[in-house]
Amino acid sequence: MGDEKDSWKVKTLDEILQEKKRRKEQEEKAEIKRLKNSDDRDSKRDSLEEGELRDHRMEITIRNSPYRREDSMEDRGEEDDSLAIKPPQQMSRKEKAHHRKDEKRKEKRRHRSHSAEGGKHARVKEKEREHERRKRHREEQDKARREWERQKRREMAREHSRRERDRLEQLERKRERERKLREQQKEQREQKERERRAEERRKEREARREVSAHHRTMREEYSDKGKVGHWSRSPLRPPRERFEMGDNRKPVKEEKVEERDLLSDLQDISDSERKTSSAESSSAESGSGSEEEEEEEEEEEEEEGSTSEESEEEEEEEEEEEEEETGSNSEEASEQSAEEVSDEEMSEDEDRENENHILVVPESRFDRDSGDSEEGEEEVGEGTPQSSAPTEGDYVPDSPALSPIELKQELPKYLPALQGCRSVEEFQCLNRIEEGTYGVVYRAKDKKTDEIVALKRLKMEKEKEGFPITSLREINTILKAQHPNIVTVREIVVGSNMDKIYIVMNYVEHDLKSLMETMKQPFLPGEVKTLMIQLLSGVKHLHDNWILHRDLKTSNLLLSHAGILKVGDFGLAREYGSPLKAYTPVVVTLWYRAPELLLGAKEYSTAVDMWSVGCIFGELLTQKPLFPGKSDIDQINKIFKDLGTPSEKIWPGYNDLPAVKKMTFSEYPYNNLRKRFGALLSDQGFDLMNKFLTYYPGRRINAEDGLKHEYFRETPLPIDPSMFPTWPAKSEQQRVKRGTSPRPPEGGLGYSQLGDDDLKETGFHLTTTNQGASAAGPGFSLKF
C-alpha cells in the first residue's frame, strides 16, 4: 500500500480515454483468444470428468492467464486490475473484496488530491497575503523615511539659516569693532598730531624766548656801559622800557589771555611737561630762592608758554615803533626805567639759564662717569647761589660749561634708543669666534645667569660721522625678522663710550663652512634635505617680511648641536619694496653672487638670495664651492661654462645689462651641471638645482615653491633635526685661520679688518699673551 501511495499520480482525461480504448482493444483480443481456446477444448473433450477437469483447468488458466500478468505490469499493479472489466460470473468473493478495497483507496486518493489542491490554493493565497503585507510594510517604511528626510532637510535649512545669521552677526560685530578701532586709531593719530604740533610750538616759543633773552642780555650790557660812561647814548632806551612797564603793556596782556583761550587744548596736553620743567628749574636754582619766587616764576613761565609766535612778533613791532616815537624822553626817566627793567631781565635770564643747564634726557646706567661730573657742578652752583661767575677760591671744572644751545646740538640722537641697556662688563669673554661683515663675534658668558652667548661688536671706526647705517640696518632687520631658523637677538649692550655697541645673540656651536672643512664625509642626502628645508624656511620668512639678506653663504649659516640651522650676519641685509629701486650691485660674496649682479644690474629682488641658496645646495652635496671664481670675470666664465651661455631668448633683457654691452663672453652651448653631481643628486634634486640656478630672475624659483618641491618628498626622506650627528664645536677652540673663501663686499665704506689690537684702549680688550689670536681668558678688561 505504501508503494502504491508513493507511485500514485493523477491522470489527465486524455490519458484515461486512451487507457480505456487500449483496454477495450485488449479485452477484444482476449475474448477472441478465449473463444478460440474454448473451441479447441470442446473438440478435444472425451468425457465429463475430463471436461470438468478441463473446465477447472480453464478456470485456472483464465484466472492465471498471461494477459492478466502482462496487464498488471503495464498498468502498474493493482490499479489496472480494478479497471479491467471481467465477466461477473468469473469474479470470486476474494476479488470482490479486493475490488472494494481498491475503490476505497481510490476514494481516499481523490479526497487527498482534493485536499492537496485546496492546500495549494491556501498556500498561494497565504503567499499573496504575505506579499501584500510586505508591500504595505515597505510603503510605510518609505513614507516614514521620506518624512524623516523632509524633517532633516527642514532642520538643516534652519541650522543653515541660523549659522548664516550668526555669521552675518559676527561679520557685523567685526565690522563694528574695526570701525571703532579705526576711530580710536584716528583719534590717537589726531591726538599725537596735536601733541606734536604743541611740542613744536613749545620748542619754537622756547627758542624765541632764548633769542629774546640773548637780545635783552645784550641790551643790558649796553645799558650798563651807558650808565658808567657816556650818558648821551641812553636817551633812546627809556621810552621802550617805559612802554614795556607802563600802561601801554596792558593790551598786550589782554591779547595773551585771548590766545590762551584759543590754545587751551594745547596747554592741557603740555601741562605735565611744563610742571616737570618748572620743578627742575626750581631745584636747579640757588639756595637763596624762596617758595614765593618759585611760584612767581612758574606763573611767568605759564604766561610766556601760552603766548604764540604772532603775539611776540606784534609785541616786538610795537616796541620798535614806540622807540622811534618816544626818542626824545628825559635822562632821569630813562635811568629809573633802565634800572627797573634791567633787574627784571637779570632775574629772568638767570632763571632761563638755570633751566637750560638741566638736561631732560635721563641718565643711563652704562655712563655713570658723566653723572659724577654733573653732581660736582650742582654742588658748585649751590655754594655760590647769587653769583653767575665763580670766584677765585671756588672750584673751576676742567672743561668750561657749554651754552644751552650747544648742549642740545651735541646730544646724540640715538641716545634715547639705548637707555636702559646693560653694560658689556656684565659678560665674561671666553674667546673670539669670527669676524663678520661689519663686526667681530665673541663667545661670552653672562655673569648673572651663566648662559653662553655670542657678542657681536659693531664696527664704529667712523662714529664721528654718526651711528653707521649698516649697524642700524642690521639691528633693525634682525629684530624684525625673528624666526626659529634665524639667529635670535637677546639684547643690545654698550661699553664705556657710545662707540662700543654690542649685539647679544644666542650662541650656536657651528657654522657650516668651518664644519664642512673638518668633516671627513659629506652630509647624507637626508641631512642635506633637512638643512635645505630649514634654510628655505628662514629665507621665506625674510622675503615674506620684505627683507633681502644679500649675503647668504655657508659661513653665515649656523648649525646647533640639536640640528637647527639659523641664518646669521645681517650686515648687508636691507628692506625692499614694490616697485623695485636701484640698489648697489656690489653685494653678496663673489662665489654666491647671482649673474644679474655680476653683469651690473641695479634693480634686483629676492632672486639674488635664491641663487645663493642654489650655490649653498651644491656646496652641501660636494663639500666644495659650486663656482669658486677669482674675480668677477672669472666668476661669470665659470657660471657660463657649467650652465651654458645665456641669450636674449632664455633671459629677456640680457642684452641690456651694462656688462653685456661692454664686452663679449665665450659661447658655451650646453648645460654641463649634471655631470658634476652624478649619483649625489636624483632627477628631482637636479630639477630643483636648475630652478635655483635659472638665469632669468623672473623665472627663478622662490622659497615657498622650493619648500613644496617633490625632491623633499622622495626617498630618502629628510631626517629629524634631533638625529643629526654632533661634532666638537670649533668656535669653542682656539681660532684657526679661515680658508680661501673671499671676503664679502664692504659697500664702499672702507672698513678695515678689526682685530684684537684695535680693541685696546677702546673700552675692553682680551687679556691674552698672544696678539691677534684670542684664547679663553678671564674676562673683559674695561676702561672707563
UniProtKB/Swiss-Prot annotation:
GO CC annotations, alphabetized: cyclin-dependent protein kinase holoenzyme complex; nucleoplasm; nucleus
Record note on quaternary structure: May interact PAK1 and RANBP9. p110C interacts with RNPS1. Interacts with CCND3. Interacts with CCNL1 and CCNL2. Forms complexes with pre-mRNA-splicing factors, including at least SRSF1, SRSF2 AND SRSF7/SLU7.
Description of activity control: Phosphorylation at Thr-437 or Tyr-438 inactivates the enzyme, while phosphorylation at Thr-584 activates it.
Ranges where the Protein kinase domain occurs: 427-712
Gene name of this polypeptide: Cdk11b
Alphabetized PANTHER family for the sequence: CELL DIVISION PROTEIN KINASE (PTHR24056), CYCLIN-DEPENDENT KINASE 11A-RELATED (PTHR24056:SF107)
Active site annotation, chain numbering: D551
Name of the molecule in the record: Cyclin-dependent kinase 11B
Highest taxon of source: Eukaryota
Basic residues: compositionally biased ranges: 95-113
Sequence ranges of Low complexity compositional bias: 278-289
Organism: Mus musculus (Mouse)
Bias type Basic and acidic residues, positions: 18-60, 114-131, 138-227, 238-263
Biased composition (Acidic residues): 290-353, 372-381
